[in-house]
């Protein structure tokens, strides 16, 4: 989860988020090298008094600044494509959940179970218990099993919303009349928080998302008690 004054990403909870963190570090390293080279050239130009009279027609230099950016773009594009394909790949999900955005709450329907559906509203500040997080707690959490592929279908009943859980690397737009899908696999149990990430009206800030990831046997007990 996030902490006060945190500058980095949340700890990765899924393979997708781990890939995103690796890609971020890879891209940041390339940006750092480019920035260092540009700053070095600027300092060199500001401090040196030497003049190259043939600078206007140097084919070697033109080849370098054409080929080098192409190589850099390839180094960025290849891992980017790998991560994108990994995020879109859905192989035999063992559970499918339909998530609907409303103004201003979420509703969840476990399509593999009969009559297992509920709405999820934010708990107001005056109703919080000791240790609960302000603007992040809900009355009904989305409970999922760990270490199993889960498909989440996302749509909206009214306006644009966005279902996002940063520690799992998830952010999917909820669009009225359209069904988007995303897959998630949690590597450890716990509580994971998210929020609506698309401005959707006056109470946009009051649409938290809470995922409770538990071992499979506890999930089966929970689903049996509600179904």
From Swiss-Prot:
Residues where Phosphotyrosine is found: 218
Cofactor entry: Cu cation
Binding-site residues for Cu cation A2, renumbered to this chain: 196, 198, 200, 204
Positions of transmembrane segments: 15-45, 60-87
SUPFAM superfamilies (alphabetical): Cupredoxins, Cytochrome c oxidase subunit II-like, transmembrane region
Membrane topology category: Multi-pass membrane protein
Protein name: Cytochrome c oxidase subunit 2
Source organism of this protein record: Mammuthus primigenius (Siberian woolly mammoth)
